[in-house]
Amino acid sequence: MKENKSLHSMAAVPLEALVKEEYRTYQIYTLMDRAIPYLQDGLKPSQRRILFTLWKNSNKGLVKVSSLTGLVLTLHPHGPASVEQSIVNLAQDYTFSNNYPLIDKKGYFGERMETQAAAARYIECKLGKVAELLLFDDMNQVVMVPNYDEKVMEPVGLLPKLPIMLLNGAEGIGTGFSSVVPSFNHEDIIKSMISFVETGKIKKIKPYFRYYTDKVETDEKGRIITRMSFKQVGEKIFINEVPRGYDSSKIYRHLNKHMDNDFLKDYIDSSVDNMINVELIFKRGQSPTLKEVETTMGVISSIVPNYTLITEKGVKVFHTPEEILEVFTVQRVLVTKRRYELLIKDYEDRLMKNNEIIRFIKEKHYAIAEKKANRKDYIDYLSKSKFFYAEYLADMAIYRMTKEEVEKRLLLIKEETSALAEFRKILKSPALLKQKLVDELEDVGKKLSAIMDEKEKEKKRVFAKGGTVKPPTTRTRQ
């Protein structure tokens, strides 16, 4: 019996090389598929899949977070816990979460002092008005690929009108890389983009955290600093702002430390939603000044920006937010140009279709249908008669074979011819293309401001009705 040498012909692979290759594969996977946001749309894959799923199911209105999780898992090859948390994160709107939440919510999704949301089966959400405004207008340009099991299609990247990672900030840690992108104000972003389009010069933008009432500082090392601030009302002193990363448990630990040091006797936390209001109670006979309290109890929090993003060529580290804006604005110019190319193609097709309908009616090709054996023979006849839209014409109802239909199509041809001429004029002129982008940015700015103003009014209406007000919390040393 001959030995099968092929069983032993595989070359030996050193263990070190095998481990390095597997580590590299895992590194690429964590970066590209989980941890780091993409430059094109500012989203991580899980966030993109959530928003795309909501967009496809937007006619359903509010859906349970648990139900949405199940829908997203058809695209996302990971467990439900991470998807549920990503949904909650996209919907949260308290200070230091999202300046512009992409998901509208119903139920308790957490607040500034108590960030933990209710269970997924008790809370509901839908695609947010911000996402509707920014994300889905250019879906005919979005590249679609099969999902992980090749059963449905999903987008490689969306084409937002503004950079989402700069609007809401982004954080992620992958193998060998991390990303820490602070958030910025949409008005500053839009002004900077318009400046770059019109003059080629980008305007600097400053970090912005919605509802944060103190000054956001940047030190000489580039760290972004937020701090605890105090106010005095009569003889009482209150904490009225806390740094990034401080929730109730961290604040209480900080206050309890000062109680242990006998600087503080007690405190009453009356904070609600984004409004921080913690009354400090000192021992009888102790009346520290506001300055003394700030010096003794004040704390700061800092973040070091790290603008690491995924690009078409892989991982890229940007040095400033303005550098990201430059690349993103160039992308928007190309998207605007492609939009008009597609519009021209669409209107050319419309003109051809309307002209064929007129010829079909005037030459009475519909009368030939009764002489054909079946629909296929009739379509073959129309195709031989040089009708490109033969199938559409074969399905036209007989009541439309009238002068009225011809007149309607002639009117459409006039309108479409005029629009087509305008689109071609814009496409041929770089200046007009840039102006269209500027007009779009200005329009987006107004609409986004209106959306956020309406959200603020709605929040005030809820508070006026006593919707989410919690009772003051008194914390005392045991």
Where are these predicted regions, by residue range?
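Charged, surface-exposed alpha-helical interface/stalk elements
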Residues: G200-Q478
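Catalytic phosphate-handling regions of large nucleic-acid enzymes and associated NTPases
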Residues: M1-R223, E279, T474-Q478
